[in-house]
Amino acid sequence: VNYNTRFYPLNQHARQMVADGELGDIRLISGHYMQDWLLFDTDWNWRLEPDKGGSLRAVGDIGTHWIDLTSYITGLKVTSVMAELSTFVKTRQQPVGPVETFSQAGSGETIAREITTDDTALLLLRYENGARGSVVISQVSPGRKNAMQWQIDGSTSGASWDSETPDHLWIGHRD
């Protein structure tokens, strides 16, 4: 898997800030990764089928990118996870015949299919240094095409980045 957001310039800069101790000891890592491409019951992709894409759809498809990025920036590994997985679109219309990702559903024939993979996930994380984290992952958030955001809070400063404004890095200080 190509975790390409690691290489955005401001994510590289944030990683260097953490390595240089500019945030202090990392205490809290939070954020989200939201998309809308599977919002409707007529949206279909092979990732919906557990035998093809695995049982963890939203977590496996996009959540791993957020966890990789924040672990890369902080240098911290996740040691435990508590997850709340939800499937809101429990039945989808699978087109008969080939399907192209992100294409509009045609007026062709469909088959109703039960969905067991996750549309959303709420994850609580523990990191090896004792830091805590939380992330919301969704593939059913209207208007969010590919919105990844992280906030990293240390003992002296915090930093935040959002993929929808990738040329901005927020840095916060108490004073």
Where are these regions (language model features)?
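NAD(P)-dinucleotide binding in Rossmann-like oxidoreductases
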Residues: 106, 111-175
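Predominantly a Rossmann-like dinucleotide-binding segment in NAD(P)-dependent oxidoreductases
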Residues: 5-114, 169
